[in-house]
């Protein structure tokens, strides 16, 4: 007997922004979550297709183009089941709390609640068990809805391969250098004179928040080894922006407490799977990590859309033994797909499967 799943109606806040656009694109083809309410600030009452600058592949879906932009008001969303919030830092926090108080499940790509102790910072393959924090959140805050956050795109590009390694090996450090695309700064983004013919350092503040998020994610990975303790692991990041459109490229030097073979780590990364793959969630790639063997791959232009769910796999390559206790690898993440909208949709699918969002 085939069980029919009801269609879940989604509201996308900031629907004309770069991440909002990816939510629209991906949900327009989703088997059971559909865009039903497109919220915006400056274009209320206007058709979506007339006001959006479609900064992604394809075109505005025909069934979406004539939908009106509506106010960001929970009282107008009686028939909405899920809120996706890629709102900017500062603006997002109070809006998301308002929706949770009104009983809505909120999936947030914003940093405003990422370090609230009762709010999951969810990477579904690494820490799916943390969704149980929702129960504590509801009890503590006395609301029927909830907020779940997804990490910074940069943090995910490192945390997914590092989490797979940290789970099975005595990793005691990682030193990360990032080369990040322009879309990570939103639209219209960075002035051209700042970034063309330049590499733009993002500064100590961005470095620090990247590391802080990676530490939280690693602290929640269920490990098969007992040491070293996380407090004995050294992490450092140096982050930069360059003039590519999509795709964050990261170089990681990973050190270990004992001799560790690069070939063994490579096999671990190739075989890494998580609960989304076991559950066959619609947006879960069959391989969350794709390992490339060519010495000149991954490349941003060719590989940011890699995988059977395009843009949802982290692509790893150039894996090399540096010394007996250190390896080097590079990772590539599509920052607005896996690193933002796609990660949010995957989180929602897990929450549906686990009963936190009504099927």
Curated annotation (Swiss-Prot):
- Write down the EC number: 1.2.1.75
Q: Which residues bind NADP(+)?
A: 16-19, 183-184, 335-336
Q: Which cofactor does it need?
A: Mg(2+); Mn(2+)
Origin, by domain of life?
A: Archaea
Q: How is the cofactor bound?
A: Divalent metal cations such as Mg(2+) and Mn(2+) ions at 5 mM.
* First-tier enzyme category under EC: oxidoreductase
User: What would be an example GO MF term here?
Assistant: NADP binding
> Do the record's keywords include Secreted?
no
- One Pfam annotation reads Semialdhyde_dhC
CDD domains per the UniProt record, alphabetical: ASADH_C_MCR, ASADH_MCR_N
Q: Which UniProt keywords apply?
A: NADP, Oxidoreductase, RNA-binding
Active site per the UniProt annotation: 153 (acyl-thioester intermediate), 248 (proton acceptor)
Q: Give details on activation and inhibition.
A: Activated by dithioerythritol (5 mM) and inhibited by the thiol-blocking agent iodoacetamide (0.1 mM).
User: What catalytic activity is recorded?
Assistant: 3-oxopropanoate + NADP(+) + CoA = malonyl-CoA + NADPH + H(+)
How is activity affected by pH?
Answer: Optimum pH is 7.2, with half-maximal activities at pH 6 and 8.
Q: Record's family?
A: Belongs to the aspartate-semialdehyde dehydrogenase family.
The subunit field of the Swiss-Prot or TrEMBL record says: Homodimer and possibly a tetramer.
The UniProt function text for this chain reads:
Catalyzes the reduction of malonyl-CoA to malonate semialdehyde, a key step in the 3-hydroxypropanoate and the 3-hydroxypropanoate/4-hydroxybutyrate cycles. Can also use succinyl-CoA and succinate semialdehyde as substrates but at a lower rate than malonyl-CoA.
Recite the other comments.
This enzyme contains bound RNA, but the physiological role is not known.
What is this protein's name? Answer: Malonyl-CoA reductase
State the organism named in the record: Sulfurisphaera tokodaii (strain DSM 16993 / JCM 10545 / NBRC 100140 / 7) (Sulfolobus tokodaii)
């Amino acid at each position: 007997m085939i069980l029919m799943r009801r269609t879940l109606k989604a509201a996308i806040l900031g629907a004309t922004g770069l991440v909002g656009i990816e939510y629209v694109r991906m949900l327009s083809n989703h088997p059971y979550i559909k865009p039903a309410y497109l919220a915006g600030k400056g274009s209320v009452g206007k058709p979506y297709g007339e006001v959006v600058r479609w900064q992604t592949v394809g075109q505005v879906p025909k069934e979406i183009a004539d939908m009106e932009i509506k106010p960001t008001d929970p009282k107008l969303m009686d028939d909405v089941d899920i809120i996706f919030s890629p709102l900017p830092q500062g603006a997002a926090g109070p809006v998301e709390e308002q929706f949770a108080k009104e009983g809505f499940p909120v999936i947030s790509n914003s940093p405003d609640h990422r370090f609230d102790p009762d709010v999951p910072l969810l990477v579904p393959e690494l820490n799916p068990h943390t969704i149980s924090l929702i129960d504590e959140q509801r009890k503590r805050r006395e609301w029927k809805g909830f907020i779940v956050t997804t990490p910074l795109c940069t943090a995910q590009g490192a945390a997914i391969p590092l989490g797979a390694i940290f789970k099975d090996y005595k990793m005691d450090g990682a030193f990360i250098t990032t080369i990040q695309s322009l879309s990570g700064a939103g639209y219209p983004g960075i002035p051209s004179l700042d970034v063309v013919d330049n590499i733009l350092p993002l500064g100590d503040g961005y470095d620090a928040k990247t590391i802080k998020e990676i530490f939280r994610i690693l602290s929640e990975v269920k490990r098969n080894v007992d040491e070293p303790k996380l407090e004995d692991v050294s992490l450092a990041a140096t982050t930069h922006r360059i003039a590519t459109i999509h795709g964050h490229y990261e170089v990681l030097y990973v050190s270990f407490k004992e001799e560790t073979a690069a070939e063994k780590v490579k096999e671990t990364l190739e075989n890494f799977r998580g609960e989304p793959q076991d559950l066959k969630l619609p947006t879960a790639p069959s391989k969350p990590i794709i390992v490339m063997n060519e010495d000149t791959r991954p490349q941003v232009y060719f590989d940011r859309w890699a995988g059977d769910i395009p843009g949802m796999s982290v692509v790893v390559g150039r894996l090399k033994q540096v010394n007996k206790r250190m390896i080097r690898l590079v990772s590539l993440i599509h920052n607005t797909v896996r690193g933002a909208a796609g990660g949010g949709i995957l989180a929602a699918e897990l929450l549906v499967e686990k009963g936190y969002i009504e099927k």
